[in-house]
Amino acid sequence: MTQFITHKWLAALGLASSIAAFPALAAKDVVVAVGSNFTTLDPYDANDTLSQAVAKSFYQGLFGLDKDMKVKNVLAEGYTVSDDGLTYTITLRRGVKFQDGADFNAAAVKANLDRASNPDNHLKRYNLYKNIAKTEVVDPATVKITLKQPFSAFINILAHPATAMISPQALEKYGKDIGFHPVGTGPYQLETWNQTDFVKVKKFAGYWQQGLPKLDSITWRPVTDNNTRAAMLQTGEAQFAFPIPYEQAALLAKNKNLELVASPSIMQRYISMNVTQKPFDNPKVREALNYAINRQALVKVAFAGYATPATGVVPPSIAYAQSYQPWPYDPAKARELLKEAGYPDGFSTTLWSSHNHSTAQKVLQFTQQQLAQIGIKARITAMDAGQRAAEVEGKGQKESGVRMFYTGWSASTGEADWALSPLFASQNWPPTQFNTAFYSNKQVDSDLAAALKTNDPQEKTRLYKEAQDIIWKESPWIPLVVEKLVSAHSKNLTGFWIMPDTGFSFDDADLK
């Protein structure tokens, strides 16, 4: 519990004059303005990246992802995998303490993974861990995890921000309320959570990495209004803000006290086409639509330059991603292909969007105008979350009204399986997952399944390349852009940046 002692009481104790004789060091307190509120401080029960990002203040995993989305050791020192791909033996870092004084060890790992893989706990991230058969303690610094079936991307699952190590003592003490009482091994510990206003964390004196953290506190403050978030940087009320609205970026860039940063992301924006429905069952129609979109112009019109044209169906930062020559803008070629497909005068269709914010509206309007130039009349609908859940995610192929669908995907494991399987595997048509193209190819299914059964990087590369080659050629999507992430911070704040999955990195953050 934080104790506050007033200046009056210090004076009464005869201490005020001696304290005043020494200049006080300025506290290194940072305020971060973010775009939405937090749902929980339990990473296993959070579906939103922001809640998991804030939870990194308190929590760490066995592994993590660096700024290039490559796996790195955190609380683990290394691992081995059995020849059959079923057993992972992980060596743990010694001498690490939780913020409540409990030891971090193999028993703590078992407690967390047993909880995460138990369907009776109804945790939102259960699907990440449902392949775990059992977790065993070999010795205090070694844990053995056995899977139900081989899954070669498993270490990426352990590197996912959801896979945090929570103090077993805290789990026992707080139970289902652990989301309000985070206790981890991270650099900061919870000071205050005002659920309508902010989360404040303070330096954890017992942190295992010497010399860290350098900040005294971080206050995470949700500010949903774009203009207010930007204004807080201008006035010094905040030292870091994300996301920065595109229309505010130029203004903030002119402020000599601020630095505007556009960083790479793994957020791919695309339009899927329902290949089970006419006219999108015709490959020439799908090719025509890809030629019809001027992606360079789209980057300027809808994203103010803060995006790059897509060069594949998997963003370049993701492991095993393949890049291709981007589709050129060629409306004449598009009209020729439509004619060959039997649609010389074009056709009418619908274009839905998974979001209704201003950027999505701009993409819809731009695409509608581009399609009109080749004779396609698209009726556009920007959906809210409820509509999307009911009309897109909740309906199977026979009852689905999806034809063209603008959306996005971020593979936060950093590995190709989560970028491909939910979106292209035959078994993942809605309502199972998010294959809104209702795409199906036996070779792609076979390649994706085989890639999870091998730990040979060369074989995985071959399989993922073959799958992506087929998907790119068959064009169930109109790949549009990969977004850039726009943030801004005070120039005296260093080591604080945005990860490609829109999480935050602040391990080495300092206020000069």
UniProtKB/Swiss-Prot annotation:
Protein's name in the database: Glutathione-binding protein GsiB
Localization of this protein: Periplasm
Biological classification of the source: Bacteria, Pseudomonadati, Pseudomonadota, Gammaproteobacteria, Enterobacterales
Assembly with partners or alone: The complex is composed of two ATP-binding proteins (GsiA), two transmembrane proteins (GsiC and GsiD) and a solute-binding protein (GsiB).
Annotated PANTHER family: GLUTATHIONE-BINDING PROTEIN GSIB, PERIPLASMIC BINDING COMPONENT OF ABC TRANSPORTER
Protein family (similarity comment): Belongs to the bacterial solute-binding protein 5 family.
Extent of the signal sequence: 1-26
The keyword Signal is assigned to this record: yes
Cellular component terms per the entry's GO annotation: ATP-binding cassette (ABC) transporter complex; outer membrane-bounded periplasmic space
UniProt keyword annotations, A-Z: Periplasm, Signal, Transport
Highest taxon in the source lineage: Bacteria
NCBIfam families named in the record: PRK15413.1
Functional summary from the UniProt entry: Part of the ABC transporter complex GsiABCD involved in glutathione import. Binds glutathione.
Pfam families registered for this protein in UniProt: SBP_bac_5
MF term (GO), any: peptide transmembrane transporter activity
GO aspect biological process, one term: dipeptide transport
Keyword Transport: yes
PROSITE patterns, sorted: SBP_BACTERIAL_5
